[in-house]
Amino acid sequence: MRFCKKCVMPDTKPDLHFDEEGVCDACRSQEAKNQNINWQEREKEFFELIKKYKKHPVYDCVIGVSGGKDSTFQVVKMLELGLNPLCVCFEPSVPTKIGRKNLDNLNHLGVDLIHIKRDPKVYQKLAREAFIRTGDNEWQNHLGIFTSVPRIAVNFGVPLIIWGESPQIEYGGPASSKNKNILGREWLEEFGGLLGNRASDMLGVNGIAEKDLFLYTYPSDEELQRVGVTGLFLGYYFKWDYKKILEISKKYGFLTLDHPVETTYENFENLDCYSNHVHDYLKYCKYGFGRATDNACLDIRLGYISREEGVRLVQKYDGKPPKKAIKKYLEFSGFSEEEFQKIVDSFTNKKIFKRDENGKFLRDYDGSLVRKDECVLK
């Protein structure tokens, strides 16, 4: 297991590549953001692009929102540019009180908001089956977010969708994907986290019918072409710095916690849903890195902390089971603690974590998995 020489990301991250100097492509991408990209030209390109979309009689664009810092910033930015966005929130798996406050705050910025309250029975069936199949407790929610937004765009006849950061630019990925400014079906299937499991694969599971999957199914090419739907990454056109975005969002009423969230050292991540913290923990079990690593890597690349400090933060915060979030998730999903742990263990990486003579994973005093010596971050 190798770690990037500049940040602290391991080579187990899917689609991440290291060069001959041992530096990951996400770090190289950050260098390009600072040195090779003319952001003024890209901003001009965006301003010219949106002119043709400011013709809709009511809404100029659709924005998928959670009430988080990024979606708050997206709404603020579009309002500043004189656009009238229609906002769409696909209900989180296990909503939080602060998340609801932030969503209400976003609404009160002066936008119409469609809050999709999905059928809880169908949703739970999808959640349970997807977790068993993929080891991803948020598969159904990520799918719902990425399909319901274009569905609303099609049904309301609004051709422009505004997404936030470009994950491949910020977190690394194939070189060809970094120059893509559009989120469409191709991006969803390659990078949307479906893990080889499509909505259609759930047909018939515990009585799930085709009509139950409507919100989880991407609009047809014919529908998209009829409206001319295009989904753009705002992070392709504007230089993305999450701390600056956070400060702007706080200025417009975004709330943070007075303590770190369970899976990292920050107090503003994934505030809308408890289940997201379980998702971060599962990522750690599969790939050996979690949300604290993600945050530390961004902070290192943006120059906010040193790599040495990043190592310290990752060692302190990454990999600890989010006990409160797991409890909330079990109440929502109906899994027992034993069932949950059995599924987690089935997806836990045997190449990274130690096991005893019976094949059982070793755990620390706080329940954290014990890493093999060659997989310890230094």
Regions found by a protein language model. Give the residues of each.
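Long, structured ligand/cofactor-binding scaffold of large enzymes
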Residues: F73-V75
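Short, glycine-rich nucleotide/cofactor-binding loops
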Residues: C61-D70
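Nucleotide-activated chemistry modules centered on ATP-dependent adenylation/adenylyltransferase
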Residues: M1-C61, K77-K378
